[in-house]
Amino acid sequence: MNKKILASLLALPLVVPAMAQAQDNAVKISGFGTAALTWSDDDRAQFGRPNQASGAADNFRTGVDSNLGLQADYAVNNWLSLTAQGLVRQDAEEHYGAELSWAFAKFRISDDLSVRVGRVGLPVFMISDYRNVGYANTMLRPPSEVYSQVPFNSVDGADITWRRDYGNTTITSQLAAGAIKSPLDGFHVRGKDIVALNVVAENGPFTLRVGHARTRITVDDLASLNTLVGSLRAAGAGYRLPQLTDLAGQIEAKDAKGTFNSIGLTADWNNFVLQTEFAKRKTETYINDTTSWYVMGGYRIGKFLPYYTRSELKIDGSINSTVPAACPAGYPAACTPTLMQLDGAVRRIPVSGVGQGEQTTDTIGVRWDFASSVALKVQVDRIKPSGNGLFINAQPGFSGPVTVGAVALDFVF
């Protein structure tokens, strides 16, 4: 990401007031942020959000849940507007980093139809457009079991949105297409030929969403993966074991197909609050096929909103090791030990890496809207991973369960 561009974006509040007055307040500046402390009760692994390189262990960390965002909107005329959004948060480089979340031109074709061109949010979740805006959400953070399953937050391309009322129900359909490169812990994931369809039905306090996304995934700078793929191919050729070469092709992530299907429901009726999502991920590479879901329920008591969430991530399918247990008689002495090492590495794939693994989480929390545009949240998660689950930097012997606590102050301006 070009730091100079983002620095200019984040400096907009210093330079646009005069411009806004001169142009009849055409430029609008808004922002959001979260100041948080996060900790856990286990020092053998770290808890972090998706795309973070480090997280909280048995110490207090500000970077896991804290962020600051700024958005600038400029209305050129009644059919064209420009939007840019910058976000500062702890990222895959193990420190606070700046990113350009959105940067698009919006063309209003009619009252029902609009087109955006540039960097737009990728509509794959119930709260895709405001997942980083803590104040807009009941929970302190989106459940990682679901929201870790797609590494892309935005797409460089375009989307088209069509909205129509049918009696008391409003239907919104959104189709996005493009490509993006997303940094993760020590490597990048590239998605090309991304196509995402998002359909939302709203009726009173209820919102139903259905989505489908597909892409071609490439991971070409992950050292451990490249070493394994190269070793399998070398062993396959050197020991005349073609199944190893075939296995290397199955593991390698190079223009591999991937799909993500999801459905979600929200309700805010009287004092009851409900939010739930169910998702299925499938890929033709080393990345696991998964099922993930969560259900959150809460009840509003004055300015307080206590809530409970149950979330789960399960592996449906993963790479199966076809490495032989031993080499045939007469092969070099080093052959069987080599196969044993390769087999162990292949078997570790389903439970290691970003967005891999299985886990369940029980969450209790409370939101307190004690002032205008400001909310205080306290949340405790009890996480039961299978293996490492979604924890990062796990040490030998880590197993869980782990308790994670956080206090956050969300605000918008």
Protein language model features and the residues they cover:
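Outer-membrane beta-barrel pore domains
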Residues: 42-44, 56-57, 104-108, 214, ...
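Positively charged n-region of N-terminal signal peptides that target proteins for export
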Residues: 1-4
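Transmembrane beta-barrel outer-membrane domains
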Residues: 24, 61-65, 95-100, 151-153, ...
